[in-house]
């Protein structure tokens, strides 16, 4: 089995974190985003994975060598000399994706969910047509492109309606697909969109189906969604009774959904939760309050600080009695002074903040 992950460009929406690492390597719940996806593909029997990128991927190549060995898989980088949108990368990787008759998976690198690849493969083989897209149900379909089925058919797609004014359905494209290699004949090697060009052609030939995703789904490509996705992921681990979570019986855990790396140090009289992820080698002082936040590797939160709806970047320090909230994001190695208030600040790497940030701003 084969899979292609659409990684794309520089991850500008997730800056300042992506100024330090490519977006797929940023840790989501203490594991790089791309590793969540690679593990799910491997579990479904995938042995060849292509990462479609449009910049030199040296950092990722080095990082992923370990996982090639660990899972006995082959990871190749398909580097676009010009951005090829969402369908062009499939054609560029035709040598691998089309090397045999078996179907292949395609997914966006920003999507987090309970990846249903095994079930998707079974469903796809059962209907026997060219492609299947995973769809998720949303409460406000008018913000999205909606998938509409053929009358009298539970899964065959009839059309797509972009940001519908009146209700036509509530299923949207979840950014995960499975195709037979014959789809590659439909795609030219140029910048071309899978959603706007390839899918309508498949629909016209009655060759495209949808598969309903159960459970949570989030595109975590920007900070507010990264935090929301963290909450959804931790809640799903709680539902499954996962051992990855810190037991709610720990005196500092409040409201559950807390994941703390074993190497992190937690001070006295802290209140942590709900929805908090603490990475390796993090140091949390005494009397700290953490809620709906992510502390990345090597960061420090000093005594009595309050951190809410915030991503604290690698090796950053939050001072005593400081208060961070409202989707604040600290890049790598940022220092927030004692008693400083940051309201929705996006702070670039290596900065030191000595004055309050009262309104959301980018601090360069």
UniProtKB/Swiss-Prot annotation:
UniProt keyword terms in alphabetical order: Cell cycle, Cytoplasm, GTP-binding, Nucleotide-binding, Nucleotidyltransferase, Transferase
The Gene Ontology terms for molecular function here are:
GTP binding; mannose-1-phosphate guanylyltransferase (GTP) activity
Family membership noted in the UniProt record = Belongs to the transferase hexapeptide repeat family.
InterPro entries linked to this entry = GMPPB_C, GMPPB_N, Mannose-1P_guanyltransferase, NTP_transferase_dom, Nucleotide-diphossugar_trans
User: How is this protein named in the record?
Assistant: Mannose-1-phosphate guanyltransferase
EC number(s) per entry: 2.7.7.13
One cellular component GO annotation, for this chain's record?
A: cytoplasm
SUPFAM superfamilies under this entry? Nucleotide-diphospho-sugar transferases
Source organism of this protein record = Hypocrea jecorina
The first-level EC class reads transferase
The UniProt entry's GO biological process terms, in alphabetical order, are: cell wall mannoprotein biosynthetic process; GDP-mannose biosynthetic process; protein glycosylation
Biological or metabolic pathway of the protein: Nucleotide-sugar biosynthesis; GDP-alpha-D-mannose biosynthesis; GDP-alpha-D-mannose from alpha-D-mannose 1-phosphate (GTP route): step 1/1
Gene3D superfamilies this protein is in?
A: Hexapeptide repeat proteins, Spore Coat Polysaccharide Biosynthesis Protein SpsA, Chain A
Query: Among its keywords, does the record have Metal-binding?
Result: no
Q: Any idea where this protein resides?
A: Cytoplasm
What is the catalytic activity of this protein? alpha-D-mannose 1-phosphate + GTP + H(+) = GDP-alpha-D-mannose + diphosphate
What function does this protein fulfil?
Involved in cell wall synthesis where it is required for glycosylation. Involved in cell cycle progression through cell-size checkpoint.
Q: Does the keyword tRNA processing apply?
A: no
Predominant place of localization:
cytoplasm
């Amino acid at each position: 089995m084969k899979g292609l992950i659409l990684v794309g460009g520089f991850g500008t929406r997730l800056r300042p974190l992506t100024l330090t690492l490519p977006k797929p390597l940023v840790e989501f719940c203490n594991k790089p985003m791309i590793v969540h996806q690679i593990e799910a593909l491997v579990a479904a029997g995938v042995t060849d994975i292509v990462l479609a990128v449009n910049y030199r991927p040296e950092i990722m190549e080095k990082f992923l060598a370990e996982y090639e060995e660990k899972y006995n898989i082959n990871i190749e980088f398909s580097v676009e000399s010009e951005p090829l949108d969402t369908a062009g990368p499939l054609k560029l990787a035709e040598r691998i994706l089309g090397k045999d008759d078996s179907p292949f998976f395609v997914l966006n690198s920003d999507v987090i969910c309970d990846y249903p690849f095994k079930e998707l493969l079974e469903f796809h083989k059962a209907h026997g047509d060219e492609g299947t897209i995973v769809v998720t149900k949303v409460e406000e379909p008018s913000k999205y492109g909606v998938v509409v089925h053929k009358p009298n058919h539970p899964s065959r797609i009839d059309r797509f309606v972009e940001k519908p004014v009146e209700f036509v359905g509530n299923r949207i494209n979840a950014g995960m697909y499975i195709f037979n290699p014959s789809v590659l004949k439909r795609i030219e090697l140029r910048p071309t969109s899978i959603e706007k060009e390839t899918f309508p052609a498949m629909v016209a030939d009655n060759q495209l189906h949808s598969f309903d995703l159960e459970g949570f789904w989030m595109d975590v490509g920007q900070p507010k969604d990264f935090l929301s996705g963290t909450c959804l992921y931790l809640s799903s681990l709680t539902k499954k009774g996962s051992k990855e979570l810190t037991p709610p019986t720990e005196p500092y855990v409040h409201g559950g959904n807390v994941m703390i790396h074993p190497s992190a140090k937690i001070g006295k009289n802290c209140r942590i939760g709900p929805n908090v992820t603490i990475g390796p080698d993090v140091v949390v002082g005494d009397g700290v309050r953490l809620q709906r936040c992510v502390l990345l590797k090597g960061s420090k939160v000093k005594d009595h600080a309050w951190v809410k709806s915030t991503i604290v970047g690698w090796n950053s320090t939050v001072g005593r009695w400081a208060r961070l909230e409202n989707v604040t994001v600290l890049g790598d190695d940022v220092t927030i002074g004692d008693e400083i208030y940051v309201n929705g600040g996006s702070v670039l790497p290596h900065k030191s903040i000595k004055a309050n940030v009262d309104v959301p701003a980018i601090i360069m």
